[in-house]
Regions:
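Hydrophobic residues at beta-strand termini and immediately following loops
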Residues: 3, 30-32, 61, 139-142
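ATPase catalytic-site recognition across NTP-hydrolyzing enzymes
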Residues: 37-115
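Mg2+-dependent endonuclease catalytic cores in nucleic-acid-processing enzymes, primarily RNase H-like
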Residues: 9-12, 16, 132-264
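ASCE P-loop NTPase helicase motor core
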Residues: 1-52, 178-184
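Short, well-ordered loop/turn elements at secondary-structure boundaries
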Residues: 25-26, 107-109, 123-125, 161-164, ...
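Gly/Thr-rich phosphate-binding beta-strand-loop-beta motif of the actin/hexokinase/Hsp70
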Residues: 106-132
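Beta-sheet entry/capping signal
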Residues: 1, 27-29, 111-112, 127, ...
Length: 265
């Protein structure tokens, strides 16, 4: 027996519930809505909104996965993205078939490849996304497990294929192992950040390329206590304003479980 209120989507309880509804696992599902209780009515439900807030009230009262959970990006928005924008890739490449392609390179366009590096020991995934800079459309994605060295090489190979895309690799901890591969292979359009994190000159970066000998620059992007809230705020803004085009169901699944915990994402 597994007893719970909904708490977002993409987690074990949600996947097990959906599987039971579709009849693809051995679980039976029973939904007990709040209005089955003889002493509860619409006035009680409205009072729960006031006491708990709309999101937590949806979680505790409505048996609604989409509007439950403290997701950074509103679940309704993510569901809309899945319905209207997500597509099967045109091609799946690589030994693990985890490099998904929605659009081949257009050599009149500029692209950015943003990469997040995992340890490569099976406990987490490394991932990157390739975006068309002008249209903000996702054109390729990788999510899988491989060594940091192999992942660094894959980043360089795909960035080179996509018109020498601006290659942005997070440089925290294990990210340096993948970054070193990019540096050793002499990839020219590698993203550099100022060491004091006071600025990121995007126009200069894209058009002129930073020189690796600039002493005030460090390879990659540093996700710190200073930059993380800014990145998360901009991510939420892009989705809320529909400024970005997302093709990947895998990415939407990840965002459904990207939640606030003690006011931190």
């Amino acid at each position: 027996i597994a007893l719970s209120t909904p708490n977002g989507v993409g987690n074990w309880f949600h996947k097990t519930w959906v599987g039971a509804e579709e009849g693809i696992n051995d679980w039976n599902f029973i939904k007990l809505h709040w209005n089955l209780h003889p002493e509860r009515n619409e006035d009680w439900r409205k009072e729960q909104d006031k006491l708990l807030g709309p999101s937590l009230a949806a979680q505790e009262c409505d048996c609604d996965f989409i509007t439950s959970g403290q997701t950074v990006i509103d679940g309704v928005i993510l569901d809309e993205y899945r319905e209207k924008q997500c597509q099967d890739p045109l091609e799946k490449r690589g030994v693990d078939s985890n490099l998904w392609i929605w659009q081949p390179p257009n050599y009149t366009k500029d692209y950015v490849l943003s990469a997040d590096v995992s340890r490569g020991d099976g406990s987490d995934y490394s991932a990157f996304h390739v975006m068309d800079i002008e249209t903000m459309e996702q054109v390729a994605e990788y999510k899988g497990r491989m060594s940091t060295k192999d992942f660094g090489n894959l980043c360089v190979n795909v960035a080179t294929e996509y018109n020498n895309a601006l290659l942005v690799v997070e440089n925290n901890n294990i990210g340096w192992a993948a970054l070193q591969q990019c540096i050793d292979r002499g990839y020219e359009n590698l993203f550099y950040t100022s060491k004091d994190l006071k600025y990121v000159d995007t126009e200069h970066q894209i058009n002129n390329r930073y020189r690796t000998q600039d002493r005030n620059m460090v390879a990659g992007f540093s996700m710190t206590m200073k930059t993380r809230p800014l990145v998360i705020s901009k991510l939420e803004e892009y989705f809320r304003e529909k400024s970005v085009i997302v093709r990947s169901n895998r990415l939407i699944d990840e965002l459904f479980v990207f939640i606030y915990n003690n006011n931190k994402a």
